[in-house]
């Protein structure tokens, strides 16, 4: 079990100090009681030349203090100058406060990394914090995973790991869409492959059915289990048999595809389970909303612009979504008496709340962006605003090879499968590059570029940083033979290093980057943006590689100084800090941290 960090990290520590100063000023200055300091932040300045940290305290508290922001900033700055961590304080512009820290701060930050090891940056669980449910992938069980599913899968998995690292209790969930019309289409497509397995010439696949070869094994399995008996059955009899078999086999394939990417789920929840058995959760949810006056019989006006698939010109049961922030009210029951997809989704989210989740996160594909407002309205309604829903939209992936679009596969029929991509470039390249752009931006994924061994390939550059660190350790044993090989023993040995020997500005820049890791984890977790970890790792690796390169040209900057064991030990401690943080961040992203690379 990994221990939790026990002390506040540098940015959190400085934030606490700023809060204490502001609280003292509030008390002495007669500010209103109960001032909320949560808007006060301490973060790196956009321009590194402005210092090591910056705070907006004066800007956001000036109104309560009944003072000009710059005047309040000067009061805060005066007290910060007396802090033992601070070397210099500047007030800039209308009232921003920039801080430069004492050089000794950075060696102390490295000492923290060496002391905490894998726990560095990890947040201890907060007692009573809401449980988090992250729903991702949730692809229809109608075929193999394609490259579009891949991005949402990696994003949801990495986000879940990030939130767990940040101290949250997270459940990873897959919602199986096994109750809609698409599974009947799947069954009819599989039945055609069953007839083919029996020796029939089925000709071209009719329009509207799934054309890919991936259903041929389903047809063979049906033949093995039932012989030709299904052919004598009426549709109503064979359809559920074929449907259940096809769904089961497709879900097995989907789970295999997810395993190839090391995508994990704690729960696979069936949509059909909401409406089958003795407890119809969808009907219950509609009754729940009816009792509160949140559904009514009404007629929707025709949609403006493009037609909406769920609009029908008739009197129907509607959810009063506009009362909870949506643009229009939403149908719950179709003209044939079946539930709309939305009705099932409402019941699903109510069921999550009943299971104890108050923080809900859904990962949607780009084609579901219009679904966000209605789902957030539904969650407000069925939880009395006691739960929140954050919807993260994952944009499209353009699959390229040397800049040219990749052709579709025969097996899938009309898309490139996730498995094909993983088999060609490897799991690590897929996972890292799917996270190396913000989720709501279109991603160009070039199969040739992601396996290049160059600085232009981020996954290689970051992994190579970890491998280079271990290479330095191996080489160092020639001049420092007492350096242990085993990681735990090596870290314990390096804790005794005299870190004050790390005095070069380039070394301090690298230590500053390491000190930023806990703050990066915190901000990425709060924003639900795991790409921030990927960006940070690339920046850290870049600074590490740059320092190594400088040592090639300037011998006094080399990590291993043959005639100075004390300095070598201090620099190896710095390398250990880099290796530990790279491994930690890569673990959050689900990417391997190799000790050596060819």
Curated annotation (Swiss-Prot):
Keywords: Aminoacyl-tRNA synthetase, ATP-binding, Cytoplasm, Ligase, Nucleotide-binding, Protein biosynthesis. The keyword Cytoplasm applies. A motif ('HIGH' region) lies at residues 139-149. Its EC number is 6.1.1.19. One of its GO terms (biological process) is arginyl-tRNA aminoacylation. It holds the Pfam family DALR_1. It catalyses: tRNA(Arg) + L-arginine + ATP = L-arginyl-tRNA(Arg) + AMP + diphosphate. GO terms for cellular component: cytoplasm. GO terms for molecular function: arginine-tRNA ligase activity; ATP binding. It is found in: Cytoplasm. HAMAP family: Arg_tRNA_synth. PANTHER family: ARGININE--TRNA LIGASE, CYTOPLASMIC (PTHR11956:SF5), ARGINYL-TRNA SYNTHETASE (PTHR11956). Monomer. This is Arginine--tRNA ligase. It comes from Bradyrhizobium sp. (strain ORS 278).
């Amino acid at each position: 079990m990994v221990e939790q960090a026990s002390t506040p990290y540098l940015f959190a520590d400085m934030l606490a100090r700023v809060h204490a100063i502001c609280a003292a000023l509030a008390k002495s200055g007669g500010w209103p009681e109960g001032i909320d300091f949560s808007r006060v932040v301490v973060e790196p300045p956009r321009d590194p030349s402005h210092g090591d940290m910056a705070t907006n305290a004066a800007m956001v508290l000036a109104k309560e203090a009944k003072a000009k922001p710059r005047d309040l900033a000067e009061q805060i700055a005066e007290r910060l100058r007396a802090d033992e961590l601070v070397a210099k304080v500047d007030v800039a512009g209308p009232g921003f406060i920039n801080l430069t820290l004492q050089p000794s701060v950075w060696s102390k930050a490295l000492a923290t990394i060496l002391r905490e090891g894998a726990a560095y940056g990890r947040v201890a669980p907060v007692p009573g914090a809401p449980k988090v449910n992250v729903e991702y992938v949730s692809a229809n069980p109608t075929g193999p995973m394609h490259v579009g599913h891949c991005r949402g899968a990696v994003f949801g998995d990495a986000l879940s790991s990030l939130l767990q690292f940040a101290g949250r209790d997270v459940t990873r969930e897959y919602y199986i869409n096994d109750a809609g019309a698409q599974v009947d289409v799947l069954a009819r497509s599989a039945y055609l492959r069953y007839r083919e397995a029996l020796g029939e010439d089925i000709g071209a696949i009719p329009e509207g059915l799934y054309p890919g070869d991936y259903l041929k094994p389903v047809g063979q399995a049906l033949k093995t289990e039932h012989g030709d008996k299904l052919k004598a059955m009426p549709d109503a009899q064979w359809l559920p048999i074929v449907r259940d078999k096809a769904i089961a086999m497709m879900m097995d394939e989907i789970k295999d595809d997810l395993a190839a990417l090391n995508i994990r789920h704690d729960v696979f929840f069936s949509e059909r389970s909401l409406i089958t058995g003795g407890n119809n959760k969808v009907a219950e949810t509609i009754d729940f909303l009816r009792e509160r006056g949140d559904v009514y019989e009404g007629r929707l006006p025709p949609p403006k612009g493009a037609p909406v698939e769920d609009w029908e010109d008739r009197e129907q049961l509607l959810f009063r979504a506009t009362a909870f922030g949506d643009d229009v009210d939403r149908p719950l029951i179709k003209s044939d008496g079946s539930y709309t997809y939305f009705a099932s989704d409402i019941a699903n989210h109510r069921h999550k709340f009943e299971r104890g989740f108050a923080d809900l996160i859904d990962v949607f594909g780009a084609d579901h962006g219009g679904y966000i407002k209605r789902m957030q309205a539904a969650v407000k309604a069925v939880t009395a605003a006691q739960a929140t829903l954050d919807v993260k939209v994952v944009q499209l992936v353009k699959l390229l090879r040397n800049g040219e679009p990749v052709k579709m596969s025969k097996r899938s029929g009309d898309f490139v499968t996730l498995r094909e991509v993983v088999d060609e470039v490897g799991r690590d390249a897929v996972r890292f590059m799917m996270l190396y752009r913000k989720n709501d931006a279109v991603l160009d994924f070039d199969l040739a570029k992601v396996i290049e061994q160059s600085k232009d390939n981020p996954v290689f550059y970051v992994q190579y940083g970890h491998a280079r660190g271990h290479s330095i350790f191996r080489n160092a044993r020639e001049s420092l033979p007492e350096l242990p090989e085993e990681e735990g023993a090596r870290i314990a040995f390096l804790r005794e290093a005299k870190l004050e020997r790390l005095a070069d500005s380039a070394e301090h820049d690298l230590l500053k980057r390491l000190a930023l890791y806990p703050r990066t984890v915190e901000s990425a977790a709060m924003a639900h943006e795991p790409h921030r970890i990927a960006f940070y790792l690339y920046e850290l690796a870049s600074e590490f590689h740059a320092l190594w390169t400088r040592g090639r040209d300037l011998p006094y900057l080399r990590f291993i100084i043959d005639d100075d064991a004390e300095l070598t030990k201090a620099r190896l401690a710095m390398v250990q800090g880099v290796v530990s943080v790279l491994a930690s961040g890569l673990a959050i992203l689900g990417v391997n941290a190799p000790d050596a690379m060819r």
